[in-house]
Amino acid sequence: MFTQANLFLVLLLVIALIAKNNSLILAVSVLIGIKLIGLDQKIFPVLQSKGINWGVTVITIAVLVPIATGDIGFKQLGEAVKSSYAWIALGAGILVALIAKNGIVLLENDPHITTALVFGTILAVSLFKGVAVGPLIGAGIAYLAMQAVKFFSG
């Protein structure tokens, strides 16, 4: 029962409790619960392979709720395109999506980078009250930085 993985999860739970980070508390508790009831061999591979896509889908649904409720409509869209901030947000959205695209490739092809990114995300979430939406974006930024290092060093 006292495996390295379990010890790591308990340590993360303690850090999450100290940092009062509800998202990390819930995430670690769910993983510990799945392990305790013995479904980890079946559920973890699915969570690992599909979880990011599910998370992006849930975030997308949450972002689209104001459209579904009618709080945001064509009138607000028309008003937004007149705002310089809206154009900045549009550009940022495009840029982040393109950066994240490269992040997926990096995460799939370089497991030790995945470990560093996940640990960085855990630190940011637990210690700095960050939000764990960053692994794809973080991987994309890491990919761009690696390409820049390659370009300038060789």
Curated annotation (Swiss-Prot):
It is a multi-pass membrane protein. The keyword Cell membrane applies. Keywords: Cell membrane, Membrane, Transmembrane, Transmembrane helix. It is found in: Cell membrane. InterPro entries: UPF0756_TM. Pfam families: DUF441. Its main location: membrane. Coiled coil: none annotated. It comes from the Bacteria. The chain crosses the membrane at residues 8-28, 54-74, 87-107, 117-137. One of its GO terms (cellular component) is plasma membrane. Belongs to the UPF0756 family. This is UPF0756 membrane protein BPUM_2558. It comes from Bacillus pumilus (strain SAFR-032).
